[in-house]
């Protein structure tokens, strides 16, 4: 689980306005934070298949949000990909 302070920082960095918590940029940022936090767990616990299912679900949700953002506003998509260091 992401700590509250880290979560608030991710929201602040990706928000489009002061009270924005639901834009695709914020959602993708939070999912990326959760995914990055889980990666060390799967390096040491390779056979945690139930946990891996949750990870793959998060990755899929992030991909869908990125596809939505790309279809709505390609410039925001490109900026977010560059900021988070994700592949296209």
Curated annotation (Swiss-Prot):
Pfam families attached to this UniProt entry: Ribosomal_S15
Keyword terms: Ribonucleoprotein, Ribosomal protein, RNA-binding, rRNA-binding
Listed SUPFAM superfamilies: S15/NS1 RNA-binding domain (SSF47060)
Keyword Ubl conjugation: no
GO molecular function: rRNA binding; structural constituent of ribosome
InterPro entries: Ribosomal_uS15, Ribosomal_uS15_bac-type, uS15_NS1_RNA-bd_sf
Source species, domain of life: Bacteria
UniProt key word Ribosomal protein: yes
One GO term of the biological process aspect: translation
GO CC annotation, single: cytosolic small ribosomal subunit
Subunit structure: Part of the 30S ribosomal subunit. Forms a bridge to the 50S subunit in the 70S ribosome, contacting the 23S rRNA.
Task performed by this protein: One of the primary rRNA binding proteins, it binds directly to 16S rRNA where it helps nucleate assembly of the platform of the 30S subunit by binding and bridging several RNA helices of the 16S rRNA.
Family membership noted in the UniProt record: Belongs to the universal ribosomal protein uS15 family.
Listed PANTHER family: RIBOSOMAL PROTEIN S15, BACTERIAL AND ORGANELLAR, SMALL RIBOSOMAL SUBUNIT PROTEIN US15M
Name of the protein this chain belongs to: Small ribosomal subunit protein uS15
């Amino acid at each position: 689980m992401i700590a509250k302070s880290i979560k608030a920082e991710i929201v602040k960095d990706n928000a489009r306005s002061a009270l924005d918590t639901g834009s695709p940029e914020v959602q993708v940022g939070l999912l990326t934070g959760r995914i990055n936090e889980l990666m060390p767990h799967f390096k040491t616990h390779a056979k945690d298949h139930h946990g891996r299912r949750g990870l793959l679900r998060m990755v899929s949700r992030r991909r869908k949000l990125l596809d939505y953002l790309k279809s709505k506003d390609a410039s925001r998509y490109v900026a977010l990909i560059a900021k988070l260091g994700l592949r296209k």
